[in-house]
């Protein structure tokens, strides 16, 4: 097990040795608090875009289902006739220059796996740059837009925002409640009180002060042909290899089990870069992976290789809240 995986295990399941990291946690909390206070005072060269900005992010380390929810938000905005752009840090991407406009024909190595997935699914204008204000300016210079979605960036305070949406895993929650490196929190837990909405991935119903959303499988997609098959393409009890290089691979494996298949799990690091030989498993069985992994593996995927398409389904209460929030933003912009 890699060090990152060991830390995640300790943060979310507990480990007595983490107490040794408390002094570093105190330093981290101090720095995080000072950065936020500077933002609240309007210091540090904050950029306010001429259109509303909605930040979708995390206060925890580890996967929360952010990309599927962003896809849902894009479509929700489009249903209102809005022209939407997306900015992202582009973690792991190696573009020739920054900011970089992502297109559907680029490689994941050039564009980043999550940005490429978003563009391939939606065709939305998307720019990657660790300097998010610069990415926003590049998109707005290129074409007129009504709204910007920031993929992650909750802690990137140089970009002013009009709405903050935070995602939590309903099972993992806030882990041990401590900040990095003694726990999984990027900011103290009280930060949740200042955001506009908290969405709980996997919650059965809307928790107090938050909203539920689920990731529902919709189809199996063949990697080579793009053919979509219904979920009963593999009958119950089918053994298969399952590959996931995401923030929370266990959730993906549990989803396959809930579909009554028998996955042999192969977990990789989040944003892993794959080679063809890493996809050759024994015994010879179908291989099913996440869509995020598929954008990196399509060129060398084995013959019987599929990805599981999933869709974010927020609670009706959140859908109504977001629609009303958009109306307020547009009326005041």
Swiss-Prot record:
Signal peptide start-end: none
Protein's UniProt keywords contain Lipid metabolism: yes
Pfam family name, one: LpxK
Catalytic activity line of the entry: a lipid A disaccharide + ATP = a lipid IVA + ADP + H(+)
GO molecular function: ATP binding; tetraacyldisaccharide 4'-kinase activity
EC number: 2.7.1.130
GO terms, biological process: lipid A biosynthetic process; lipopolysaccharide core region biosynthetic process
Disulfide bridge positions per record: none
Residues engaged in binding ATP: 60-67
UniProt GO cellular component terms: plasma membrane
Superkingdom to which the source organism belongs: Bacteria
This protein's UniProt keywords: ATP-binding, Kinase, Lipid A biosynthesis, Lipid biosynthesis, Lipid metabolism, Nucleotide-binding, Transferase
Pathway participation: Glycolipid biosynthesis; lipid IV(A) biosynthesis; lipid IV(A) from (3R)-3-hydroxytetradecanoyl-[acyl-carrier-protein] and UDP-N-acetyl-alpha-D-glucosamine: step 6/6
Family indicated by similarity: Belongs to the LpxK family.
Role: Transfers the gamma-phosphate of ATP to the 4'-position of a tetraacyldisaccharide 1-phosphate intermediate (termed DS-1-P) to form tetraacyldisaccharide 1,4'-bis-phosphate (lipid IVA).
Listed name of the protein: Tetraacyldisaccharide 4'-kinase
Organism the protein comes from: Azotobacter vinelandii (strain DJ / ATCC BAA-1303)
Source organism phylogeny: Bacteria, Pseudomonadati, Pseudomonadota, Gammaproteobacteria, Pseudomonadales
């Amino acid at each position: 097990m890699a060090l990152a995986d060991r830390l995640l295990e300790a943060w979310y399941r507990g480990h007595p040795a983490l107490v040794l990291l408390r002094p570093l946690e105190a330093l981290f909390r101090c720095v995080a608090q000072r950065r936020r206070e500077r933002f609240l005072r309007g210091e540090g060269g904050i950029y306010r875009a001429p259109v509303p900005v909605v930040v979708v992010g995390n206060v925890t380390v580890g996967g929360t289902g952010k990309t599927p929810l962003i896809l849902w938000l894009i479509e929700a905005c489009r249903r209102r006739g809005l022209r939407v752009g997306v900015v992202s840090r582009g973690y792991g991407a190696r573009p020739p220059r920054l900011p970089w406009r992502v297109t559907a024909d680029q490689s994941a190595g050039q564009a980043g796996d999550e940005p490429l997935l978003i563009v391939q699914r939606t065709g939305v204008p998307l720019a990657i740059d660790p300097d998010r204000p610069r990415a926003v300016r590049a998109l707005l210079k290129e074409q007129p837009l009504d709204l910007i979605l920031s993929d992650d960036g909750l802690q990137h305070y140089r970009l002013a925002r009009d709405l903050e949406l935070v995602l939590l895993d309903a099972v993992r929650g806030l882990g041990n409640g401590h900040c990095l490196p003694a726990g999984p929190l990027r900011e103290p837990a009280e930060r949740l009180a200042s955001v506009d909405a908290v969405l709980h991935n996997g919650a059965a119903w809307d928790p107090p002060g938050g909203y539920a959303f689920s990731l529902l499988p919709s189809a199996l997609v063949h990697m080579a042909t793009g053919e979509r098959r219904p979920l009963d393409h593999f009958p119950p009890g089918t053994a298969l290899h399952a590959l996931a290089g995401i923030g929370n691979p266990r959730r993906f494996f549990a989803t396959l089990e809930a579909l009554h298949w028998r996955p042999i799990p192969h977990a990789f690091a989040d944003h892993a870069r794959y080679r063809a030989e890493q996809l050759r498993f024994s015994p010879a069985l179908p291989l099913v992976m996440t869509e995020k992994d598929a954008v990196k593996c399509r060129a060398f995927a084995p013959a019987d290789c599929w990805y599981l398409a999933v869709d974010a389904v927020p609670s009706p209460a959140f859908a109504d809240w977001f629609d009303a929030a958009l109306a307020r933003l547009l009326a005041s912009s």
